[in-house]
Amino acid sequence: MASNSGIQWYFDDFEVGQVLQTGSRTVSEAEIIAFATQFDPQPFHVDHDAGAASIFGGVIASGWHTCSMMMRLVVDAFLSQSASMGSPGIEEIRWIKPVRAGDTISVQLTVREVRPSRSKPDRGVILLLWEASNQHGEPVATIKGLGMFGCRPAPSSL
Amino acid sequence: MASNSGIQWYFDDFEVGQVLQTGSRTVSEAEIIAFATQFDPQPFHVDHDAGAASIFGGVIASGWHTCSMMMRLVVDAFLSQSASMGSPGIEEIRWIKPVRAGDTISVQLTVREVRPSRSKPDRGVILLLWEASNQHGEPVATIKGLGMFGCRPAPSSL
């Protein structure tokens, strides 16, 4: 199929131990507050003064905002050029250190498991470890995420 | 502390087996596309026609959008009236069924574990099962989430 020409990552292209590095993304206080106002309006996420007075000593990003920013980095790094068929879920998230206004985060991806589908030979599931760090090299969050990917079409169908 | 008067949920108030029901939230195609354009711009999340042509048969919400909507329901249901000290992480997410434009979701919360902190006697961690379902009663996603909560202040400090 000629329309597959933009796809660089099929299920077949993943190997345990592979490492990929995403680009980076800086988050502003306005973005932190805008996300949290919609989805996680706890005082330490949406209010400058309440954040400063909290145990965190300043506004911090909602953990869901951190995960969503990590997702965008992962989409831009490879998922948008992959045969992604969505995700059945996440095995674990750890929010290690707050993400604060002005922080710049990037993600390192490591392939942990490669599982061909038992019932559908045209696809398989990849377990990826996502490790986000900030501009100081400090870990801020990890995700162990599952992704389903289509297999590379057989040569006869090209 | 008089400023604690708005808090109805301290660590002490959780018991294994407790069930809480959130309100509900309806999501539009415009909201699905707006979220995904920022954080998860895969074709089946951001483009009406690409969604229709995909294995999903229509635009579906990013899994991170579904989790973020669930978070807002949980904040409104009880977290905003709790002694929440944030979350160390998530034990598992399962995206069971796509959330589509026009769907209305609500969440049932069940307390699974109550773990007093070993090192800090003023707090503890709760493991909650979040079960989201749509307007047809179909499960769409589950989250096993950790939350840290402060203990109720001793009477002598009131």
Q: For the regions a protein language model found, what residue spans apply to each?
A:
Chain A
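Hot-dog-fold acyl-thioester-processing enzymes
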Residues: 2-89, 154-158
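HotDog/MaoC-like acyl-thioester-processing domains
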Residues: 1-15, 95-104, 108-158
